[in-house]
């Protein structure tokens, strides 16, 4: 029993704390409560921060979704964005005019772009290299340098020469150190180097077509034709420079004299001048014939040049030739041509006779032919010749020559027994050319009177 009581007392002691312990616990409780409260507050702050971050992330996600839907609504299916596409791929399909417009706008808005364009242009040979043509065969590189050094500093000069003879081929190249030098040189494209009037252009334009002196006029311009005059009868001993001074009295000359001989630099019988104004060209043509150093110069418009003059002369000669044949046709000849055509003319003349005229001629010969030594048979033969000429025989051998009756030896006393008229020219015997002359005489209307 005692043991049970002891155990119960011990269990009560363990189950119920002592007063000291209770007091100590009461002292420690406020501190623990404060710590717990702080922990609770910290946990609430952390939870609030996490909630804010979650809300912000959700808001950003919604904004991104809205942006993607708005931008992707018009460009669905495009994997690459425009900003990521290379700029050269965008410029490649553009035309030259579009690129020029873009570069011009960029150069106007951004000065650094304009400076960059100028730097590239100065470095490129395209804007600094010029081509000179029309040089004399004795031209050297020093002559080119002396002629072009006034326009700017020259970097390189080359006069193209023949490898065999060592003489100039008539052209060369000038390379300036700056673009301004080439521009100054091209302000006046024609220059006199030595005794030759030369012309220059940018080498990038390409080779010159046709006459090297006329070549600077690259494109056809009706206004240039109106301002260009053609001067003929220009002797080779005329100085081109003096000729230029002579025609400069009528106005300022833009080009000329053109058309000089490439080898000698002298005129080849003509010269071309292009005035700067139409009034000057008209003034030069007011007096078409001008006297210069004892020579009479003939001035025309450029389109009245040698080709047109030759064509006019050809037409004039053809007209004169036709006129001569026309006059001969009035005398009995036909259209111009060989002897066959002339014979056709006789046939045309024969057609003018009608049977009444033939009968009258026969009666005349019958009444007066005795005094002339002719008989009636000649009139009948002549009537047969004139009357049987058919209109269908025009252009060939006259019908009368093949269908005329045989003439007896007594008709033409001078011919005797020859068979010249038998069968016409086709049956003429060898060695009897006189019958041909007699046939012409009869055909022209006059009988052969004998010797």
UniProtKB/Swiss-Prot annotation:
PROSITE patterns per record: RRM
GO CC aspect terms: nucleus
Pfam families xrefs: RRM_1 (PF00076)
Comp. bias regions, Gly residues: 431-451
Region (Disordered): 1-86, 302-335, 423-451
Keyword terms: Nucleus, Repeat, RNA-binding
RRM domain: residues covered: 128-236, 227-314
UniProt GO molecular function: mRNA binding
UniProt induction comment: By wounding.
Additional facts recorded: Plants over-expressing UB2A1 display severe growth defects consisting of premature cell death and chlorosis.
Protein name per its UniProtKB record: UBP1-associated protein 2B
Organism: Arabidopsis thaliana (Mouse-ear cress)
């Amino acid at each position: 029993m005692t043991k049970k009581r002891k155990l119960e007392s011990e269990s009560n002691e363990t189950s119920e704390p002592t007063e000291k312990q209770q007091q100590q616990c009461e002292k420690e409780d406020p501190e623990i409560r404060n710590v717990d409260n702080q922990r609770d507050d910290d946990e609430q702050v952390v939870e609030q921060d996490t909630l804010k971050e979650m809300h912000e992330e959700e808001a950003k996600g919604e904004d991104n979704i809205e942006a993607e839907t708005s931008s992707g609504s018009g460009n669905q299916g495009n994997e690459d964005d425009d900003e990521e596409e290379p700029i050269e791929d965008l410029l490649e399909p553009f035309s030259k005019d579009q690129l020029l417009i873009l570069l011009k706008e960029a150069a106007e808005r951004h000065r650094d772009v304009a400076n960059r364009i100028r730097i590239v242009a100065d470095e490129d040979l395209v804007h600094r290299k010029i081509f000179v043509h029309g040089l004399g065969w004795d031209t050297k590189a020093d002559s080119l340098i002396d002629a072009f050094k006034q326009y700017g500093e020259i970097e390189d000069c080359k006069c193209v020469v023949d490898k065999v003879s060592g003489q100039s081929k008539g052209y060369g190249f000038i390379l300036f150190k700056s673009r301004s030098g080439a521009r100054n040189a091209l302000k006046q494209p024609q220059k006199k180097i030595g005794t030759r009037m030369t012309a220059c252009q940018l080498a990038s334009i390409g080779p010159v077509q046709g006459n090297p002196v006329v070549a600077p006029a690259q494109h056809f311009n009706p206004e240039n034709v109106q301002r260009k005059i053609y001067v003929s009868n220009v002797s080779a001993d005329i100085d081109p420079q003096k000729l230029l001074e002579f025609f400069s009295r009528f106005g300022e000359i833009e080009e000329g004299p053109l058309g000089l001989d490439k080898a000698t630099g002298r005129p080849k019988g003509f010269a071309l001048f292009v005035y700067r104004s139409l009034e000057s060209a008209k003034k030069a043509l007011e007096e078409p014939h001008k006297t210069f150093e004892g020579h009479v110069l003939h001035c025309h418009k450029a389109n009245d040049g040698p080709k047109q003059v030759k064509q006019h002369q050809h037409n004039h000669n053809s007209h004169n030739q036709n006129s001569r044949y026309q006059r001969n046709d009035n005398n009995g000849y036909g259209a111009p041509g060989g002897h066959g055509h002339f014979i056709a003319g006789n046939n045309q003349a024969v057609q003018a006779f009608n049977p009444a005229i033939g009968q009258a001629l026969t009666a005349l010969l019958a009444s007066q032919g005795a005094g002339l030594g002719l008989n009636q048979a000649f009139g009948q033969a002549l009537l047969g010749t004139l009357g049987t000429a058919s209109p269908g025989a025009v252009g060939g051998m006259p019908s009368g020559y093949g269908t005329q009756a045989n003439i007896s030896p007594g008709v033409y006393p001078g011919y005797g027994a020859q068979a010249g008229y038998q069968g016409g020219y086709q049956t003429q015997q060898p060695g009897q050319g006189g019958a041909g002359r007699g046939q012409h005489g009869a055909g022209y209307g006059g009988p052969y009177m004998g010797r």
